[in-house]
Swiss-Prot record:
InterPro entries: ThiC (IPR037509), ThiC-associated_dom (IPR025747), ThiC/Bza_core_dom (IPR038521), ThiC/BzaA/B (IPR002817). The gene is thiC. Its EC number is 4.1.99.17. This is Phosphomethylpyrimidine synthase. Its cofactor is [4Fe-4S] cluster. One of its GO terms (biological process) is thiamine diphosphate biosynthetic process. GO terms for molecular function: 4 iron, 4 sulfur cluster binding; carbon-carbon lyase activity; zinc ion binding. Pfam families: ThiC-associated, ThiC_Rad_SAM. Keywords: 4Fe-4S, Iron, Iron-sulfur, Lyase, Metal-binding, S-adenosyl-L-methionine, Thiamine biosynthesis, Zinc. Zn(2+) binds at residues 428, 492. Pathway: Cofactor biosynthesis; thiamine diphosphate biosynthesis. GO terms for cellular component: cytosol. It comes from the Bacteria.
Length: 617
């Protein structure tokens, strides 16, 4: 079976809309600003609207051919600004797909299958009348509100009308008000607010001009907490088809961003398929591909090879690069006494290069050159934490914080070039040390968005690290982290498959939502209230459909009560019909109401007098 047929087979599994859900769009000030929402119809006639990351894949009206890529969302906006130009781009070479790529015939076949995914790249115009800079931060600093910023504002607000009935009790709202931990979160996100946050560097909108298919989103602590899912092949396993399916599967369950961390065969061609078919921003770690180009020998890396890789990926449309420029020669000795040393792949690659040449990292030395590339395409920095702790006992040590201080310095440099920047964080941190991480990051990195891997709070949960890390993720998300990188059950054990991806995303959607509720993000709790009401009313189907994973919720319910009659029963298999606390509560309320009615009848029977003479015994 050829690759396109395989793609069609796989993607057919993920195009079904969610139960009782309809894809709708909020329209902005121009007709091509169309922001997706998922409307959930409840059995009592109400409708709940939720943030949607699934792109056109869950829209039955959308025609999708993964061999050609998704339709453009931003093409007209980019062209309308008049500050970009198409050009031929760099010439592809066999080494772009890695030194271990398929044989020449198979590679030619793979590239032929991806022919319709190729685009002539765009870059910023330069010269007397142009700045050579097309970043959202550049526009924001000039006071320009772009369509991308308006799109973000509409997306963050979503539909609010349905929430009103759950927010009418002022005393309850006051009692449940969140603590934003110093963030200034407005009740309504306006396009001007988005512009201001981007201009200040407190938020980014990752959106390469060569990724017009992306639906703009914001990463910043005044916005909803976002989650990132990692996909990508390895030298051991996986195929292009599987990775594209993981992408579509990940965004179905709520991934706001996806990183392609491929380190195996066909890296460039795999990325063609992923970027062209992704409605969410795509990130990469360019040093991985650069290392493949030198046969996996870190000391053979050069600035020239790395620079060429940056341009290659920017032309393809990658939205953000993880760059481990904070791993400096002077910091490497600080990891010598660690229990697990350097656990970042990119960090270890650069540490080995620095030691082999006994000189400063070429990423650090050429950082301004990197900025010059980024601003031509609007690629955002994700400044990598190459010295992050790999176990709880290494948390918050000098190596970690020395690198963090350097990332703060590099953030200032990036902002000088108007390059959007976020900061990567740990890792493995016990619960009582998480606040110190957030405080230090805000202080040293000037409130640039923080993007953390968890952190894992304990180290004894192989197979369950998605839970161990979601605990830390919820905490640090509340404290100010803007994006959480998911962890799957396979963390530390192997390459995640489709089911692992789903489990990791659901765990992190829970963490992100818990953080939004704790921060008091406007409307965050309304979906919880709607589900709680459905639970109290024994509207089982609504309970399933309002959850993060309707399929699993219904599956668990139906394992013991599979009949349709159980969907209207006022009990579940946990308590049965006699011991359901909610059913008993409803009965108590009914008894109380009946008692009040009886007393009212008794009052009227006495003539409606407030004071009735006591009859002698």
């Amino acid at each position: 079976m050829n690759a396109p047929d395989k793609f069609a087979q796989l993607l057919a599994l993920t195009r079904e809309p969610f139960p009782a859900s309809t894809k709708n769009y909020l329209i902005g000030s121009r007709p091509d600003v169309r922001v997706p929402v998922r409307d959930i119809a409840l059995t009592n006639g109400e409708q709940v609207s939720v943030y949607d990351t699934s792109g056109p894949y869950t829209d039955p009206a959308a025609e999708i051919d993964v061999r050609r890529g998704l339709p453009s969302v931003r093409g007209a906006w980019i062209e309308g600004r008049g500050d970009t130009e198409r050009y031929e781009g760099r010439q592809r070479v066999a080494l772009d797909d890695g030194s271990k790529s398929e044989d020449a015939a198979r590679l030619a076949q793979l590239r032929a299958e991806a022919a319709a995914l190729q685009r002539a790249p765009l870059r910023a115009k330069s010269g007397a009348s142009h700045t050579g800079n097309v970043t959202q931060m550049h526009y924001a600093k000039k006071g320009i509100v772009t369509p991308e910023m308006e799109y973000v504002a509409l997306r963050e607000n979503g539909r609010r009308e349905w929430m009103a009935q759950y927010q009418q009790d002022a005393a309850r709202e006051q009692r449940l008000a969140g603590n934003p931990m110093g963030a200034s979160i407005p009740k309504i996100i306006t396009p001007e607010f988005v512009r201001d946050e981007v201009a200040r560097g407190r938020a980014i909108i990752p959106a390469n001009i060569n990724h017009p298919e992306v639906e703009p989103m914001a990463i910043g602590r005044t916005f909803k907490v976002k989650i990132n899912a990692n996909i990508g092949n390895s030298a051991v396993t996986s195929s292009i088809e599987e990775e594209v399916e993981k992408l579509v599967w990940a965004i179905r369950w709520g991934a706001d961003n996806v990183m392609d961390l491929s380190t195996g065969k066909n890296i460039h061609t795999t990325r063609d398929w992923i970027v062209r078919n992704s409605p969410v921003p795509i990130g990469t770690v360019p040093i991985y591909q650069a290392l493949e180009k030198v046969g996996g020998i870190a000391e053979d890396l050069t600035w020239e090879i790395f620079r060429d890789t940056l341009v290659e990926q920017a032309e393809q449309g990658v939205d953000y690069f993880t760059i481990h420029a904070g791993v400096r020669l002077a910091f490497i000795h600080l990891t010598a006494q660690r229990r697990t040393g350097i656990v970042s792949r990119g960090g270890s690659i650069m540490a080995k290069w620095c030691m082999a040449h006994h000189r400063e990292s070429f990423l650090y030395e050429h950082f301004e050159d990197i900025c010059d590339i980024m601003k031509q395409y609007d690629v955002s920095f994700s400044l990598g934490d190459g010295l992050r702790p790999g176990c709880a006992s290494d948390a918050n040590d000098e190596a970690q914080f020395a690198e963090l201080r350097t990332l703060g310095e590099l953030t200032r440099t990036a902002w000088k070039h108007d390059v959007q920047t976020m900061i990567e964080g740990p890792g493995h941190v016990p619960m009582h040390m998480i606040q110190a991480n957030m405080t230090e990051q805000l202080r040293t990195c000037h409130e640039a968005p923080f993007y953390t891997l968890g952190p894992l709070t304990i180290d004894i949960a192989p197979g369950y690290d998605h839970i161990a890390s979601a605990i830390g993720a919820a905490m640090i998300g509340w404290m100010g982290t803007a994006m959480l990188c998911y962890v799957t059950p396979k963390e530390h054990l192997g390459l995640p498959d489709r089911d692992d991806v789903k489990q990791g995303i659901i765990a992190y959607k829970i963490a992100a939502h818990a953080a939004d509720v704790a921060k008091g993000h406007p409307g965050a709790r309304a979906r919880d209230d709607a589900l709680s009401q459905a639970r109290f009313d024994f509207r089982w189907q609504d309970q399933f459909n309002l959850g993060l994973d309707p399929e699993t919720a219904q599956q668990y319910h139906d394992e013991t009560l599979p009949k349709d009659s159980a969907k209207v029963a006022h009990f579940c298999s946990m308590c049965g019909p006699k011991f359901c606390s909610m059913k008993i509560t409803q009965e108590v309320r009914e008894f109380a109401a009946q008692g009040m009615q009886e007393k009212a009848r008794e009052f009227r029977g006495t003539g409606g007098e407030l004071y009735v003479p006591i009859q002698p015994a």
